[in-house]
């Protein structure tokens, strides 16, 4: 009998699906998002979720850790997992949600909806001036994984000219009009009305957006980061 520790916010219908898929060979502990303890983690053969590193303690009993996040950087550090433990993540599971969130943020900024929302709360009739449109805008998507491609498809369908940047050369997907590698980033940044970044937490992406790169952007460019926060050198934002 395998013990499965579920740290996900599941409903009864989810539990039924999990138990049906696992069969009689597994027993489940449903602890919720914040219910991981040293005791239930140590008892688990399989964990679904993202337990605190200190609780795992390189457990020899743990056979599989299925993260409910795409990022797995902290779990691959030496000493976190036992050598036999398999680690899987949720890459691709959030592409629609994150891309649509990024699109919503873009439209909010282009149409100054945050200003009008605040004015509405103050019961003020205000005019905040010129707004911009996604139609005919040049949108630079830095990182063409699942999220980047989904976002590119959204803005392209609405009339944007989409430039994609990725790490390695490859065939141009239909969701972009132009495709470049990261070595060309500085060449295309000045062209963008919108920069949408969705980079992973890798050493190469850490502090990629320096003061010098922000200076390359148009003064009125919109920058949206839906990837790892470490891609931006935070001190240059203030």
Question: Where are the predicted features?
Answer:
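An N-terminal-biased, well-structured beta-alpha scaffold segment characteristic
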Residues: 1-86, 210
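Short beta->alpha connector loops at strand-helix junctions that form conserved
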Residues: 68, 86-92, 183, 227
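Glycine-rich Rossmann-fold phosphate-binding loop(s) that bind the pyrophosphate
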Residues: 144-145
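Phosphate-binding beta-alpha-beta segment of Rossmann-like dinucleotide-binding domains, i.e.
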Residues: 83-138
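A short, aliphatic-rich alpha-helical micro-motif
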Residues: 40-41, 56-59, 134, 187-190, ...
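N-terminal Rossmann-fold NAD(P) dinucleotide-binding loop
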Residues: 148-149
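Rossmann-like adenosine-cofactor binding region
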Residues: 169-238
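Conserved beta-strand positions in the Rossmann-like core of class I SAM-dependent methyltransferases
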Residues: 163
């Amino acid at each position: 009998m395998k013990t499965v520790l579920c740290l996900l916010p599941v409903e009864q219908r989810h539990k039924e699906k999990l138990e049906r898929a696992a069969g009689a060979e597994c027993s489940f502990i449903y602890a919720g998002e914040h219910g991981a303890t040293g005791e239930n983690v140590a008892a688990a053969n399989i964990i679904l979720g993202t337990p605190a590193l200190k609780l795992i303690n390189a457990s020899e009993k743990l056979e599989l850790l299925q993260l409910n996040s795409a990022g797995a950087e902290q779990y691959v550090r030496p000493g976190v997992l036992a050598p036999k433990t398999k680690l899987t993540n949720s890459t691709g599971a959030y592409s629609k949600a994150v891309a649509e969130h990024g699109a919503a943020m873009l439209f909010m900024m282009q149409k100054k909806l945050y200003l009008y929302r605040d004015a509405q709360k103050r019961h003020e009739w205000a005019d905040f001036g010129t707004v911009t449109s996604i139609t005919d805008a040049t949108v630079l998507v830095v990182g063409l994984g699942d999220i980047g491609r989904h976002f590119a498809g959204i803005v392209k369908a609405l009339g944007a000219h989409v430039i994609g940047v990725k790490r390695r050369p490859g065939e141009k997907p239909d969701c972009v009009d132009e495709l470049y590698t990261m070595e060309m980033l500085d060449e295309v940044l000045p062209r963008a009305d919108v920069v949408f970044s969705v980079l992973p937490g890798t050493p190469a992406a850490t502090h990629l957006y320096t003061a010098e790169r922000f200076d390359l952007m148009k003064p009125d460019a919109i920058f949206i980061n839906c990837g790892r926060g470490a891609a931006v050198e935070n001190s240059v934002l203030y």
